[in-house]
Amino acid sequence: MVRVTSVGCFLLVIVSLNLVVLTNACIPEGSSCSSSGSCCHKSCCRWTCNQPCLIPGKRAKLLEFFRQR
């Protein structure tokens, strides 16, 4: 009787661990996202998982302006 109970507990632990892994799955880098919490690196930038989140500054905007002329 003890052996059956321990096998049942062991199987229950395996099933519960599989459920935890499935619910904690994160979105890999480069995939589309809606919030930072769903990305693996916790960085959702412009609806894409990126690490780090790069936002162009004044210099990048100025260079883009001169390229258009």
Swiss-Prot record:
Its Gene Ontology cellular component terms are:
extracellular region
Q: Which residues carry this modification: Proline amide?
A: P56
Q: How is it modified after translation?
A: Contains 4 disulfide bonds.
Leader sequence range is 1-25
Which lineage ranks, top first, belong to the organism behind this chain? Eukaryota, Metazoa, Spiralia, Lophotrochozoa, Mollusca
Show the disulfide pairing. Answer: C26-C40, C33-C45, C39-C49, C44-C53
Q: In which domain of life is the source organism classified?
A: Eukaryota
Domain description: The cysteine framework is XI (C-C-CC-CC-C-C).
Keyword Signal on entry: yes
Quote the InterPro entries the UniProt record gives.
Conotoxin-I_CS (IPR013141), Conotoxin_I2 (IPR020242)
- Specify the propeptide location in this chain: 60-69
Q: Name one GO molecular function term.
A: toxin activity
Q: Does the keyword Chloroplast apply?
A: no
Pfam families (alphabetical): Conotoxin_I2
- Protein name, please? Conotoxin Gla-TxXI
- Give the protein family: Belongs to the conotoxin I2 superfamily.
**Expressing tissues:** Expressed by the venom duct.
The cellular location(s) given in this protein's UniProt record come to: Secreted
Keyword annotations for this protein, in alphabetical order, are: Amidation, Cleavage on pair of basic residues, Disulfide bond, Gamma-carboxyglutamic acid, Secreted, Signal, Toxin
Please give the residue positions where the record annotates the modification 4-carboxyglutamate: E29
